[in-house]
A protein has these predicted regions:
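A beta-rich soluble binding module of mature secreted/lumenal proteins
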Residues: 1-181
Length: 181
């Protein structure tokens, strides 16, 4: 019983810390997002290391598909070190108006979708006018993904994006580049 109470206090404390950190963030997403144009497959060019992709060795993609409910099906795929494929399927929802660049995403079972902690922030913080190169993060800047419609990105476009991200407080030294062959 004491262990359960201590665990509950720890979880509530972590959520409060995360909420405070998010509230103090000055990170701004793009002004608006045309979700229909965002649909389709994106290749991961680079990312901050994270536990979600611990077993990924390369050829990482994210495919977004509009659902009749207005939500978005998310399918993340990557090649594993043994040559297999790892797939994670989730759901995203837009927060706010229909052009909001702020989304919430979950990979937990639908049965748990009523629990706020299973939904994570997914903010589009940079995207080019052609919807071919994007950066995604969340208020705490703990996660960062650079996504492209193609497996390779022109160096000039990538360098310009990296400069903008650095200007927003991201540490470019933490980036891990994703092999896409």
């Amino acid at each position: 019983s004491a262990l359960v109470l201590a665990s509950l206090i720890a979880v509530v404390g972590m959520k409060a810390y995360a909420a405070g950190k998010a509230a103090a963030s000055d990170l701004e997403p793009v002004r608006s997002l045309d979700l229909a144009r965002y649909m389709g497959t994106w290749y991961e060019i680079a990312r901050y290391p994270n536990r979600f992709e611990r077993d990924c060795a390369g050829f990482t993609t994210a495919t977004y598909t509009a659902m009749p409910s207005g939500r978005v099906k998310v399918e993340n795929r990557c090649r594993t070190p043994d040559g297999g494929t790892d797939v994670a399927t989730g759901v995203a929802r837009q927060c706010g108006p229909g052009d909001s660049p702020r989304l919430k995403v979950r990979f937990a079972p639908a049965l748990l979708s009523f629990l706020p902690p299973v939904w994570g922030d997914y903010w589009v913080i940079d995207i080019d006018r052609n919807y071919e190169l994007a950066a995604v993060s969340e208020p705490g800047r703990d996660y960062l993904w650079i996504l492209s419609r193609t497996p390779q990105v022109e160096k000039r476009a990538l360098d310009a994006l990296l400069a903008r991200l650095s200007g927003q407080g991201f540490d470019m030294r933490k980036l891990v580049y994703t092999p896409q062959e």
